[in-house]
C-alpha cells in the first residue's frame, strides 16, 4: 500500500495492524520525522518513508502495489502549528507551507498584484468578495506587513453580513491551495498513481471541499 499523506500515521497504522501488507508512506512535510522514526522502530522493514510530494510518486520503484490512498488537506498538527499561519485563529506570520514549497503565503500577500490576488480568491475559494478583499490587501500592505490577524481583519471589514461559517474560510482555503499547488499536485499525483498501479489495483481519495471534488 502507498499512503500518500502520512501525517500522524493514522492510515498507515491501521493497515499495518490489520493485515500483513507493507506500507510505503509519503509526506512533503518533514515535521513528521519523529513519527516516522517510531514507525521504523515498530514495523521494521514493513514500513518505508519518502519526503516527497504527490507528483513525485512515480519515483518510488516498488513491485506488487495493491492500493494508493490520498487523504487531502491539512493534518491537525499542521493546523495547530501557529507558526505556519494556516488557521485564521492563529496570529503572526502568514506562511501556510506544507513543505517542499517554492514560496510562502507571505510572499503572495506582500508581492502579488491586486488582479492576481483576486483570481486566487475567486478560483480557489469561490470568494464572492474577492475583488474588494484583494483591493484592501494591496492598500494596507503599503503601510505595514500583513500578518494573519491583519488579513482576518480585512476580510471581516469587507464582509459585513453574518454567515454560517467563518468569514475568512474561503480566502484562507484559496491561499493554502495556491501556496502548496494542491490542485496541480493532486492532478499529477493521480495521473502518476494510475500509471504505476497494476491491473486490479485501487486508488482512494478523501476530499474535503468542492474544488478537490471537481
Q: Over which residues does each language-model region extend?
A:
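S-adenosyl-L-methionine-dependent methyltransferase catalytic core, i.e., the SAM/SAH-binding region
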Residues: 1-214
Amino acid at each position: 500500500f502507498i499512503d500518500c499523506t502520512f501525517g500522524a500515521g493514522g492510515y498507515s497504522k491501521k493497515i499495518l495492524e490489520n493485515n500483513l501488507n507493507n506500507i510505503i508512506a509519503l509526506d512533503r512535510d518533514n515535521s513528521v520525522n519523529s513519527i516516522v522514526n517510531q514507525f521504523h522502530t515498530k514495523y521494521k522493514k514493513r514500513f518505508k518513508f519518502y519526503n516527497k510530494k504527490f507528483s513525485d510518486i512515480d519515483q518510488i520503484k516498488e513491485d506488487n502495489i495493491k492500493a494508493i490512498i490520498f487523504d487531502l488537506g491539512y493534518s491537525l498538527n499542521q493546523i495547530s502549528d501557529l507558526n505556519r499561519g494556516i488557521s485564521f485563529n492563529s496570529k503572526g506570520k502568514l506562511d501556510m507551507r506544507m513543505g517542499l514549497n517554492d514560496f510562502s503565503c507571505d510572499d503572495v500577500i506582500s508581492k502579488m498584484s491586486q488582479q492576481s490576488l483576486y483570481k486566487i480568491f475567486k478560483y480557489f475559494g469561490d470568494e464572492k468578495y474577492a475583488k474588494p478583499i484583494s483591493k484592501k490587501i494591496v492598500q494596507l500592505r503599503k503601510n505595514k506587513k500583513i500578518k494573519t490577524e491583519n488579513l482576518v481583519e480585512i476580510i471581516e471589514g469587507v464582509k459585513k453580513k453574518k454567515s454560517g461559517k467563518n468569514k475568512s474560510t474561503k480566502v484562507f482555503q484559496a491561499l493554502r491551495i495556491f501556496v502548496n499547488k494542491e490542485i496541480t499536485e493532486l492532478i499529477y499525483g493521480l495521473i502518476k498513481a494510475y500509471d504505476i498501479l497494476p491491473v486490479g489495483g485501487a486508488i482512494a481519495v478523501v476530499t474535503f471541499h468542492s474544488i478537490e471534488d471537481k
